[in-house]
Amino acid sequence: MEIRVPVQPSWLRRASAPLPGFSTPGRLFDQRFGEGLLEAELASLCPAAIAPYYLRAPSVALPTAQVPTDPGYFSVLLDVKHFSPEEISVKVVGDHVEVHARHEERPDEHGFIAREFHRRYRLPPGVDPAAVTSALSPEGVLSIQATPASAQASLPSPPAAK
């Protein structure tokens, strides 16, 4: 079963129940989609004995995806500032959320660049795949969230139309 999840601006998104523990996320590294070389990458070309003070820890240098680790909740924050909403696809396939973004070659300050990435996240047990939502902030942060199936059942249903 495959469910497409629309990517919408965050101001258009409905308010959802707050996710407990959202301030203590897990981290995924290597989220720099073609942004050039870091000091640590350049420093590997010269011996560390010559200039050890030029090195910076990779965990400080790299932007991260944030994945809170609370059981029963699902939330991911991805930096996708180099992609437009039309270039980003979010869909639910089985018990996974798949994110794909791609743009064709375009000019930048260093010449030309094309970017593409795929990310796949497993939904925790008890999360309703149909409840997955995504929103894109003006700063280029993609937020993907889902609530537990039990939380969906406890929400009041909208009044019936007459």
From Swiss-Prot:
GO annotation (BP), single: positive regulation of angiogenesis
Family membership noted in the UniProt record: Belongs to the small heat shock protein (HSP20) family.
GO cellular component: cytoplasm; cytosol; extracellular region; mitochondrion; nuclear speck; nucleus
Annotated spans, Involved in stabilization of the HSPB1:HSBP6 heterodimer: 1-72
Family annotation (PANTHER family): HEAT SHOCK PROTEIN BETA-6, HEAT SHOCK PROTEIN HSP-12.2-RELATED
Primary location: cytoplasm
Location in chain, cross-link Isoglutamyl lysine isopeptide (Lys-Gln) (interchain with Q-31): 162
Protein name (record): Heat shock protein beta-6
Record-listed Phosphoserine modification sites: 16, 157
Function: Small heat shock protein which functions as a molecular chaperone probably maintaining denatured proteins in a folding-competent state. Seems to have versatile functions in various biological processes. Plays a role in regulating muscle function such as smooth muscle vasorelaxation and cardiac myocyte contractility. May regulate myocardial angiogenesis implicating KDR. Overexpression mediates cardioprotection and angiogenesis after induced damage. Stabilizes monomeric YWHAZ thereby supporting YWHAZ chaperone-like activity.
Cellular compartments annotated: Cytoplasm; Nucleus; Secreted
GO molecular function: protein folding chaperone; protein homodimerization activity; protein kinase binding; protein-folding chaperone binding; structural constituent of eye lens; unfolded protein binding
Description of how the protein assembles with itself and partners: Homodimer. Small heat shock proteins form high molecular mass oligomers containing variable number of monomers; these oligomers display a very flexible quaternary structure easily exchanging their subunits. Heterooligomer with HSPB1; formed through oligomerization of HSPB1:HSBP6 dimers; subunit exchange leads to formation of at least two different heterooligomeric complexes, differing in variable quantities of HSPB1 and HSPB6 homodimers in addition to HSPB1:HSPB6 heterodimers.
Gene3D superfamilies reported for this sequence: 2.60.40.790
Species: Rattus norvegicus
Keywords of this entry: Chaperone, Cytoplasm, Isopeptide bond, Nucleus, Phosphoprotein, Secreted, Stress response
Signal peptide from the UniProt entry: none
Post-translational modification Deamidated glutamine, affected residues: 66
Occurrences of domain sHSP (ranges): 56-162
Cross-link (Isoglutamyl lysine isopeptide (Gln-Lys) (interchain with K-162)), chain numbering: 31
Tissue/organ expression: Widely expressed. High expression in muscle tissues.
